[in-house]
C-alpha cells in the first residue's frame, strides 16, 4: 500500500476585501475555507495561520517562491467564511486564488 501525503493545511479561496457600500478596507480579507460551511465550524480556524504562496520572476536568496502570511481573525457571516488579516495586504489580483490555512497553532 503506497504512503499517502499528509497536508498540514486546508485549501481556501480569497473572496474579497472587507467593504461597505462605498469604502473598501484592504487590511482585512474575506476567505472561504473548503469544507467549512457554518459559523460554528469556522470557530475552529480562529487564530490559525493563513498564507498566500506565489512565484516571482526574480530569485531572492535562491528561491522564486514567496509567501504573504496572515492570521484568521473572526468569522464572517453564517456560511463559514472568515476574516483574515495579513502582514502585507494581499493584492487585488489574488481574488479567487488559492490560499493555505495552516492547522497550527492548535487550540485543542
UniProtKB/Swiss-Prot annotation:
UniProt keyword Signal, yes or no: no
Official protein name in the record: Large ribosomal subunit protein eL33B
Family, similarity comment: Belongs to the eukaryotic ribosomal protein eL33 family.
Protein location: Cytoplasm
GO MF annotations, alphabetized: structural constituent of ribosome
Location, primary (coarse class): cytoplasm
PANTHER family: 60S RIBOSOMAL PROTEIN L35A
Entry keyword Ribonucleoprotein: yes
Phosphoserine: modified positions: 98
InterPro entries: Ribosomal_eL33 (IPR001780), Ribosomal_eL33_CS (IPR018266), Ribosomal_eL33_sf (IPR038661), Transl_B-barrel_sf (IPR009000)
Protein function: Component of the ribosome, a large ribonucleoprotein complex responsible for the synthesis of proteins in the cell. The small ribosomal subunit (SSU) binds messenger RNAs (mRNAs) and translates the encoded message by selecting cognate aminoacyl-transfer RNA (tRNA) molecules. The large subunit (LSU) contains the ribosomal catalytic site termed the peptidyl transferase center (PTC), which catalyzes the formation of peptide bonds, thereby polymerizing the amino acids delivered by tRNAs into a polypeptide chain.
PROSITE patterns: RIBOSOMAL_L35AE
Pfam families named in the record: Ribosomal_L35Ae (PF01247)
GO (cellular component) term, any one: preribosome
Note: There are 2 genes for eL33 in S.pombe.
Keywords: Cytoplasm, Phosphoprotein, Ribonucleoprotein, Ribosomal protein
GO biological process: cytoplasmic translation; ribosomal large subunit biogenesis
SUPFAM superfamilies: Translation proteins (SSF50447)
Quaternary data: Component of the large ribosomal subunit (LSU). Mature yeast ribosomes consist of a small (40S) and a large (60S) subunit. The 40S small subunit contains 1 molecule of ribosomal RNA (18S rRNA) and at least 33 different proteins. The large 60S subunit contains 3 rRNA molecules (25S, 5.8S and 5S rRNA) and at least 46 different proteins.
Species annotation: Schizosaccharomyces pombe (strain 972 / ATCC 24843)
Amino acid at each position: 500500500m503506497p504512503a499517502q501525503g499528509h497536508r498540514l493545511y486546508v485549501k481556501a479561496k480569497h473572496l474579497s476585501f472587507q467593504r461597505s457600500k462605498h469604502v473598501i478596507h484592504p487590511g482585512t480579507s474575506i476567505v472561504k475555507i473548503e469544507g467549512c460551511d457554518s459559523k460554528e465550524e469556522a470557530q475552529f480556524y480562529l487564530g490559525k495561520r493563513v498564507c498566500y504562496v506565489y512565484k516571482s520572476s526574480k530569485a531572492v536568496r535562491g528561491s522564486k517562491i514567496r509567501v504573504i502570511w496572515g492570521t484568521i481573525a473572526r468569522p464572517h457571516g453564517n456560511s463559514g467564511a472568515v476574516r483574515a488579516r495579513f502582514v502585507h495586504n494581499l493584492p487585488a489580483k489574488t481574488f479567487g486564488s488559492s490560499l493555505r490555512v495552516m492547522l497550527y497553532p492548535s487550540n485543542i
